[in-house]
Regions:
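Short, well-formed alpha-helical segments that are part of the catalytic scaffolds
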Residues: 14-28
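Conserved donor NDP-sugar-binding/catalytic core segment of glycosyltransferases
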Residues: 98-132
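A conserved acidic beta->alpha catalytic loop
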Residues: 24, 38-50
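Short aromatic/hydrophobic "clamp" motif used to bind/position activated sugar donors
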Residues: 87
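Glycine-rich, basic loop-to-helix element that forms the pyrophosphate-binding segment
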Residues: 65-82
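Short beta-strand/loop segment that forms part of the nucleotide-sugar
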Residues: 33-43, 63-65
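Short, flexible, basic/aromatic active-site loop/helix in glycosyltransferases
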Residues: 137-175
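A short, conserved alpha-helix in the catalytic core of glycosyltransferases
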Residues: 170, 176-195, 199-227
Length: 273
């Protein structure tokens, strides 16, 4: 069978949401074949058993990892099983409420060969647009966003720009980077940059691949003409007080420092195009 795209969902203790996600995804009306890879990093038998219910569907592969291999490595470990022109990375909580979403995303990529990464509008459970667009990060702003520093006059406008609060989320537009909660990545780009960067464990690999897209003369585009639903909960959410309680937030800081060190002398590659 010839596949147009491969969908990858990486799960960590959200198996019921993955089932709901896949059931809505399999109802998408498309004129091409796609395959699905579900990766479980939970190391939890109950979670794995729930995911295995999806084996009754064709073109779905379930991969249960014996240890949490991290976000980028888990995706790269299935590189030999990816087929088609596109890779769709999807978070477990995504829901496909309209049946033409997937087709619209792929058609737009087909018709715009200079796009390397495309992400749809996301609507959370309360009906608000999720802010999935960001500027290439600066550590001092990432810290400021989570503390009182965000309200200081000298930083307030910079934080707003970092969070892209000024953007019109109803407009198709080029952006620095997109959160990888739901993105289409051109397979040619994926192969060129060797997938997601394993310098990071949990965060920043989505920033990195968008950086590399621009470096390799591919555009990163926010596509507002179709939308998916998300639960609106971000694993990296939380203020400074949560830092000492949350291993996830501490990992976010570690990965952010790695990114900043790696790109310390680099200019914004988007400005080249």
């Amino acid at each position: 069978m010839n596949f147009k795209a491969t969908i990858i969902i990486l799960d960590f203790l959200k198996a019921p949401q993955v089932l709901e996600n896949m059931e809505s995804l399999l109802e998408q009306k498309v004129d091409f074949n796609f395959k699905n890879i579900i990766i479980d990093n939970s190391c939890n038998k109950k979670n794995a058993d729930i995911l295995k219910q999806l084996e009754k569907y064709k073109n779905i592969k379930i991969k249960i990892n014996k240890k949490n291999s991290g976000y980028p490595k888990a995706h790269n470990d299935v590189k030999n099983e990816i087929d088609g022109d596109y890779i769709l990375i999807v978070n477990p909580d995504i829901l496909w409420k309209k049946k033409n979403i997937f087709a619209k995303l792929i058609n737009y990529m087909d018709n715009n060969q200079d796009i390397g990464i495309l992400g749809p509008k996301q609507i959370n459970r309360s009906g608000k647009v999720e802010m999935t667009i960001r500027a290439f990060p600066k550590i001092y702003l990432q810290v400021a966003r989570r503390t009182f520093l965000r309200y200081l006059p000298i930083l307030k406008s910079k934080v707003k720009y970092d969070e892209m609060q000024h953007l019109d989320y109803n407009k198709i537009q080029d952006v620095d980077w997109l959160q990888s909660s739901c993105v289409v990545i051109r397979k040619k780009l994926w192969d060129k940059v060797n997938g997601l960067c394993e310098d990071y464990f949990l965060f920043m690999s989505d920033v990195e691949i968008c950086f590399q897209a621009w470096e390799n003369n591919y555009r990163v585009v926010y596509f507002s003409k179709t939308e998916v639903c998300a639960d609106g909960k971000r694993s990296s959410a939380g203020g400074f007080n949560q830092f000492f309680k949350s291993g996830v937030l501490r990992q976010h800081l570690k990965d952010s420092i790695k990114y900043r060190v790696k790109h310390f002398f680099d200019k914004n590659p988007r400005k080249k195009i």
